[in-house]
Amino acid sequence: MSNLLQSIPEGRIDFAGQKLVDTISKIVLITAVVISFIAGFALQDIRVTFGLFGASTALLSLVVLPPWPMFNQHPVKWLDSKGNGKEKAS
Amino acid sequence: MHSIFSRINNVSALLSSCTMALLAAIALSTLVFNADPKGDLAIASIKVYPGTTRRYAKTKQDLAFVNFNITADLTPLFHWNTKQLFLYLEAEYINAQGVKNDVVIWDRIVRRKEDANINVAGKNKYNFRELSASFKNVPPANYSLKYNVMPYVGYLTYGEIAKTVEPVAFPRSQPRV
Amino acid sequence: MFTEEIKAFRRLGFRHVLLQALNFATVIASGLMIWKGLGIITNSESPIVVVLSGSMEPAFYRGDLLFLTNPVSEQYKTGDITVYKIPGADIPIVHRVLETHDVPPKGRKAKEAGEPASQLMLTKGDNNYVDDLELYQGLQWLERKHIVGKVRGFLPYVGYVTIAMNDFPQLKYALLGVLGLLALLQRE
């Protein structure tokens, strides 16, 4: 099964990208809740609330889920394998 | 957040907590609206005829026929979390055996604010019969119009719109002409 | 195909597998505890139910979630929406109370003991034209003992997952299988 999973493109992003995604989704979702609640309450229409919330969720997943290049600008730089080749004798 | 699967997982976890919070906020916001509109209810006439019902097809029994007038403005009950109103007219009486009876004789579902200005001259929708099959010696009954607000999300509320000032007596059973 | 998984198991070690199993059991046990605890608080054998039929439309649609209570001290009133289960019927029914008749306890002894009136009820679905007599399977009236609870709160659509699982059993097994595999193979 893991072979199967590995064959699907996983859309990996780097560590800085992960942090960015985390922050973006938190901010967007919480503001979406607050704004859609206030808008719906002000207009006295619950459809406004769920429309706004649904739209912002769709937009968020479009921004956050695909591995856009902006989430891959800080690739991990591994050290050369040469220097680590020697093992210290104890 | 490394792969797309873990991102979907994390975002949907956050999304479900946010949705829960939003739904809870909507349910709680209903507390602000505590309109309790009143209206008028008048019983125009009551007749009692012998008849049969599906339930007791073979027993001889009395059925009461009630004509009533209702006027009420229920638009204040419609707020952003009101899905529909359920209106019902019920008769309450305690018969000679001490049985307390509540019988719904008419109801209506109101789904839009535009339809919430109620002005009905109607008669009972449902069979109105006594447990003992006869309205003889049954004390006068009170009639009241009640509502149930059903929300999109949250809890159900109930209230009373109107009640007859004095109990209305049942007339003698008369043969149907 | 499963050689990888077996390898993963070996690498994780026996203790780790046990720990995962324990985690899994904790999740199930706490779920059961919450359910039973709610049942005690609300005095209802199933405090949350999913609407299975359309007989209360447009109030409740299939898949809506209802929260019930069944207070001991309270009598049911007309207009209350109740969930009841007739002995012999497989599924509970959600319908509105149309008539109540509180018959006082018979005999002076029972009266002095302050026994509550036994309540006879008749229900009807908002979307049905006639009352529920035919659903009662030969009973004339609904009684307190048949009633699971009174609807207090409402959450739309959420229960649709369970209906989907009932309609398509494959979905249920697929979901259970995937969840089980994930729980066992997750490496934290």
Swiss-Prot record, chain C:
Keywords: Endoplasmic reticulum, Hydrolase, Membrane, Protease, Signal-anchor, Transmembrane, Transmembrane helix. The lineage of its organism: Eukaryota, Fungi, Dikarya, Basidiomycota, Agaricomycotina. SUPFAM superfamilies: LexA/Signal peptidase (SSF51306). The gene is SEC11. InterPro entries: LexA/Signal_pep-like_sf, Pept_S26A_signal_pept_1_Ser-AS, Peptidase_S26, Peptidase_S26B. NCBIfam families: sigpep_I_arch (TIGR02228). It is an enzyme of class 3 (hydrolase). One of its GO terms (molecular function) is serine-type endopeptidase activity. PANTHER family: SIGNAL PEPTIDASE COMPLEX CATALYTIC SUBUNIT SEC11. Catalytic component of the signal peptidase complex (SPC) which catalyzes the cleavage of N-terminal signal sequences from nascent proteins as they are translocated into the lumen of the endoplasmic reticulum. Specifically cleaves N-terminal signal peptides that contain a hydrophobic alpha-helix (h-region) shorter than 18-20 amino acids. This is Signal peptidase complex catalytic subunit SEC11. It comes from the Eukaryota.
